[in-house]
């Protein structure tokens, strides 16, 4: 599974299949469970009738469960798109963070949980060629369907630990907002929801799907960061 010293609890899920031959593992997708308790989430993710899973689940107290081996395709992303690729289960590792979500009392992610995520993510990144711009949330890759891990998730702190990216705010916005969102990686069939997904990740203080000046400056800063990455 991995070669690290992390304490990981094996809780196998039957909901997985083979990755396409030769497909790189070059994405890390973060979710929240969106269920009342971690026990509820673990039960669903390991129940074949629901046909949903992730590679890992992290409880609020920091316990890490491995549900699907990284070599296999877990079923967590659903209909998804990022940087020209679709069907992202094939190329990603999925981590579920226990959190009630917006339907059951959304709340901040505890420190123990975030520390466990940082340790697990760093371990994953040492073993797979995942660029920082491919560390994303479920809402980034499915903006019309999902809003997790949501506006309370601390992407900035994670990026400062070497997991994902965080831009500097530009002084002006992009010339074309749609093109800018595409450059970052978003599918823009629904412009407002794509912009809201960007806000959840990079400007979470106000998520309304409207191109206000502050959002545009953060968007331009993200474009500039992505372009420097090549």
Task: Identify the function of each model-found stretch.
Residues 1-133:
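Active-site-adjacent loop/helix surface patches within enzyme catalytic domains
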Residues 3, 9, 86, 106-230:
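Basic/polar, cationic surfaces and motifs that engage anionic cell-wall
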